Regions:
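Short amphipathic alpha-helical interface segments
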Residues: 61-80, 85
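Short, cationic-aromatic polyanion-contact patches
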Residues: 35-52, 112-134
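A short acidic, leucine-rich amphipathic alpha-helix
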Residues: 1-3, 82-89, 101
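Phosphate-centric recognition/catalysis
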Residues: 130-154
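Short, conserved catalytic or interaction motifs in soluble domains
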Residues: 77, 91, 112
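Short amphipathic alpha-helical interaction segments
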Residues: 8-19, 89-106, 116-119
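A short, conserved structural fragment
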Residues: 21-34, 105-114
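Short alpha-helical segments that sit at the start of domains
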Residues: 43-69, 103
Length: 154
């Protein structure tokens, strides 16, 4: 919207979008305007989600494997992060999983680590925020405290 309305100040555009967001929530519609990934998206209401899910069943599901979700969460909470660090945390080789996440546009190469060999550093993408309905990385749920778990296992 900012690109199309290049003469309007961004704060004016945000103000109008906030007004629209409020209006759509106030009226009973099948969708709302939400802040997602630093921008705005129209999204369906949770109350009509069962019907949307039923309509989507005609397509084969596109789920992430446990390995992909594990790797994605490691990257999300530790970015920027090198493959060797991911593999150290997971305890298994992760090149294939990283390629899969890059192909799905959920992660991206964000730079190189300043050590010998200059390994690639990975981070989450804007698509990651959109898919998981997050406005920014600060919206990630907090990690559970694992200290008590470790103490109980001794």
């Amino acid at each position: 919207i900012v690109r199309v309305m290049h003469e309007a100040p961004p704060q004016d555009i945000r103000s109008v979008l906030d007004e629209l967001e409020h209006e759509y929530r106030k009226r009973s519609r099948g969708f709302v305007l939400e802040k997602v990934a630093g921008g705005y998206q129209f999204r369906t209401l949770q109350t009509i989600q069962p019907w949307i899910s039923e309509m989507k069943q005609s397509r084969p599901p596109s789920r992430l494997s446990r390995a992909s979700l594990e790797t994605l969460s490691i990257i999300a909470y530790n970015q920027p992060i090198a493959r060797s660090q991911i593999e150290q945390i997971r305890g298994v080789e992760s090149a294939g999983t990283l390629k899969h996440l890059i192909d799905r546009e959920l992660i991206t190469v964000v730079g190189r680590k300043d050590v010998p060999g200059r390994p690639l550093l990975y981070g989450t993408s804007r698509r990651f925020l959109e898919v998981f309905g997050l406005n920014d990385l600060a919206s990630l749920p907090p990690l559970p405290d694992v200290e008590p778990i470790a103490e109980n296992s001794e």
